[in-house]
Amino acid sequence: MAKKGKKYLEAAKAVDPTKQYTPEEAVDLLKKIDFAKFDETVEVAYRLNVDPKQADQQIRGAVVLPNGTGKTAKVIVFAQGDQAKAAEDAGADIVGAEDLVQKIQDGWLDFDVAVATPPMMAQVGRLGRVLGPKGLMPNPKTGTVTMDTAKAVKDIKAGQVAYRVDKAGIIHAPIGKKSFDADKLLENFKAMNDIVLKARPASTKGIYIKSLALTATMAPGIKVNPSDF
């Protein structure tokens, strides 16, 4: 494990590890922990009472944050005909079909999100071994396999965040930048929290959110009380 720096350790002293903060307190505290020399990404981590090995508990989806993420994603679209033109008009960075599949097979991966129309998935499926492990494979659950390529591109450019529960039952998701006003971070936090709550599997019994933390790239985790939303 990497050794924590002196500034990080000093910042950690401001956080009470035994306390569950309200969302407002957590955001205010996080913004006060400011020693990084860049605009840090703010993230949330939900530890859920789910078993990702069960098909009905593999939580995955996407949400458009009301205030965006602070980053404009580079979007590629696998489409032809009208859907290709619609994607271009909506602001897609690169649109292609077989040529784009080949480009990725040749090693090009300079993009953040991939969208595909259903008819293109037979060809895009060949990229599974490359895109799958990187979380870049188009998927209907995240709205990235669709005939409405224009909406998909616009949503992603507007700050759509894809999320999925990992093998440990945790969802990690960005909700903005440290430079955001506190109220904007809170609005994004609430939007993410709402979507996680709506994704609760019917088969989950008892407590759903086991723990929740707010953090940033160079900041310690701050425990948040899920009941305070």
UniProtKB/Swiss-Prot annotation:
Binds directly to 23S rRNA. The L1 stalk is quite mobile in the ribosome, and is involved in E site tRNA release. Protein L1 is also a translational repressor protein, it controls the translation of the L11 operon by binding to its mRNA. InterPro entries: Ribosom_uL1_bac-type, Ribosomal_uL1, Ribosomal_uL1-like, Ribosomal_uL1/biogenesis, Ribosomal_uL1_3-a/b-sand, Ribosomal_uL1_CS. The keyword Heme does not apply. CDD domains: Ribosomal_L1. It comes from Lacticaseibacillus paracasei (strain ATCC 334 / BCRC 17002 / CCUG 31169 / CIP 107868 / KCTC 3260 / NRRL B-441) (Lactobacillus paracasei). This is Large ribosomal subunit protein uL1. The keyword Glycoprotein does not apply. Part of the 50S ribosomal subunit. Belongs to the universal ribosomal protein uL1 family.
